[in-house]
UniProtKB/Swiss-Prot annotation:
It is found in: Cytoplasm. Binds 2 [4Fe-4S] clusters. One cluster is coordinated with 3 cysteines and an exchangeable S-adenosyl-L-methionine. GO terms for cellular component: cytosol. CDD domains: Radical_SAM (cd01335). This is tRNA-2-methylthio-N(6)-dimethylallyladenosine synthase. Coiled coil: none annotated. It is an enzyme of class 2 (transferase). Its EC number is 2.8.4.3. [4Fe-4S] cluster 2 binds at C157, C161, C164. Residues 3-120 form the MTTase N-terminal domain. It comes from Enterobacter sp. (strain 638). The gene is miaB.
Length: 474
């Protein structure tokens, strides 16, 4: 009988990536198949996020429901991972003693051994250590699930923003070696992946080791990834302004595979509040980055994160944020009311902004962002957009669906052979959450690079000199 695994994931794209790796790992080692139903699982894993308010209570609420399943099936294994697990550690078992495994983001690769231990002597396991980049050496080969894929290139963060728990839950920055990343991307490309999203808490801080022992830069990595046959669209998430260097901007100038869309969080438009947040950059420095980006790539769209109601934020500070939003003309962005995370410096600050004022500021900010998003979308009406076709539309089985470079969902009439490929679509209608269009060009008509195998390159470049010796001309 097939053993079943259920994974519940909360939080960022890094958590989504980690959960997919857990599923692949436990399938390879124990034969577990994923199930959407917790009731039929042999192992339940909760991959948690500690960014939002009341994250811990959300975890224990779900665990309370899983406790009932364990009463019915005493052999059921329950594991809690992610950032809340890293933060709380043994306290999770103190409050929920029926939890068998507590593991952190850096120890998920040890799950097979943890499960074996619990199965063997029924003793619980708690491991929330930080064994650097070891987890990537222990994970199975990637498995593609559609034409887009996430690839983690680094873990942790050294920036220690005063409101953020990431350095405490995921550790400090550790970069994967360049060859490891390129090999994973090449494996995904061989399985039909056309778009990769490079992940890291501070992705542009990547400083991985090259094959010769030298240290590479993020700009160099972007060019290498974009050069892999089959990969025709490259994204990255999330970056920090302090390390958004000119060499990265140059990649936008000369690498068309890099999308014309960037998520670059600024958090606030007031230098005074940015200083309280520990952001180490000014508004002027942020605006200078955007100006250079738009010189290199005039059509680029920018998204951001915003925190409103940070301790000490005045009406003037908030108005400066609103001014910056208008000046940059941000596209889709993410905004939140400040909530103190335990153990961070901001948790010790006086939270002096009234709750109603926070809600009002959030409403005003989101309304402005939504207006700008609508305006950006309307500008696309009548234009031709390159779409990566993901599959059948949710709205109609008679239509296909894909995404633009700026993440707009576009539905259109097409043929099944277009799935997993690029098509150029004329935008005919802009709706609230999607767009509608018609095909004007298929991938065969685009002149994209033709993938070549090493054997075909050797055959094409093979020559014989006057003495009959075989030489190869690159």
């Amino acid at each position: 009988m097939t053993k079943k695994l259920h994974i519940k994931t909360w939080g960022c794209q890094m958590n989504e990536y980690d959960s997919s790796k857990m599923a692949d790992l436990l399938n390879a080692t124990h034969g577990y198949e994923l199930t959407e139903l917790a009731e039929e699982a042999d192992v339940l894993l909760l991959n948690t996020c500690s960014i939002r308010e009341k994250a811990q209570e959300k975890v224990f609420h779900l665990l309370g429901r899983w406790k009932l399943l364990k009463k019915k099936n005493p052999d059921l294994i329950i594991g809690v991972g992610g950032c809340v697990a890293s933060q709380e550690g043994k306290l999770i078992r103190t409050r929920s003693p029926y939890v068998d495994i507590v593991f952190g983001p850096q120890t998920l690769h040890r799950l097979p051994e943890m499960i074996n231990s619990v199965r063997g002597d029924r003793s619980p396991v708690v491991d929330v250590s930080f064994p650097e980049i070891e987890k990537f050496d222990r994970l199975p080969e990637p498995r593609a699930d559609g034409p887009s894929a996430f690839v983690s290139i680094m873990e942790g963060c050294n920036k220690y923003c005063t409101y953020c728990v990431v350095p405490y839950t995921r550790g400090e920055e550790v970069s994967r070696p360049c060859d490891d990343i390129l090999f994973e991307v090449a494996q995904l490309a061989a399985q039909g992946v056309r778009e990769v999203n490079l992940l890291g808490q501070n992705v542009n801080a990547w400083r991985g080791e090259n094959y010769d022992g030298s240290i590479g830069t993020f700009a160099e990595l972007l060019r290498l990834v974009a050069a892999i046959d089959g990969i025709d669209r490259v994204r990255f998430t999330t970056s920090h302004p302090i390390e958004f260097t000119d060499d990265i901007i140059d990649v936008y100038r000369d690498t068309p595979e890099l999308v014309s869309f960037l998520h670059l969080p600024v958090q606030c438009g007031s230098d005074r509040v940015l200083n309280l947040m520990g952001r180490t950059h000014t508004v002027l420095e942020y605006k200078a980055i955007i100006r250079k980006l738009r010189e290199a790539r005039p059509d680029i769209q920018i998204s951001s994160d915003f925190i409103v109601g940070f301790p000490g934020e005045t009406t003037d500070d908030f108005e400066r944020t609103m001014k910056l939003i208008g000046e940059i003309n941000f596209d889709v962005s993410f905004s939140f009311i400040f909530s103190a995370r335990p153990g961070t410096p901001a948790a010790d600050m006086v939270d002096d902004v009234p709750e109603e004022e926070k809600k009002q500021r959030l409403y005003i900010l989101q309304e402005r962002i939504n207006q700008q998003v609508t305006a950006w979308s309307r500008r696309m009406l009548g234009t031709t957009q390159r779409i990566l076709v993901e599959g059948t539309s949710r709205k109609s089985v008679m239509q296909l669906s894909g995404r633009t470079e700026n993440n707009r969902v576009v539905n259109f009439e097409g043929t099944p052979d277009m799935i997993g490929k690029f098509v150029d679509i004329e935008i005919l209608e802009v709706l609230t959450n999607s767009m509608r269009g018609k095909v004007v060009r298929t991938e065969d008509q685009m002149g994209l690079r033709v993938a070549e195998t090493p054997a075909s390159v050797i055959a094409r470049t093979r020559k014989e000199n006057d003495s009959g010796a075989v030489v190869y001309q690159p």
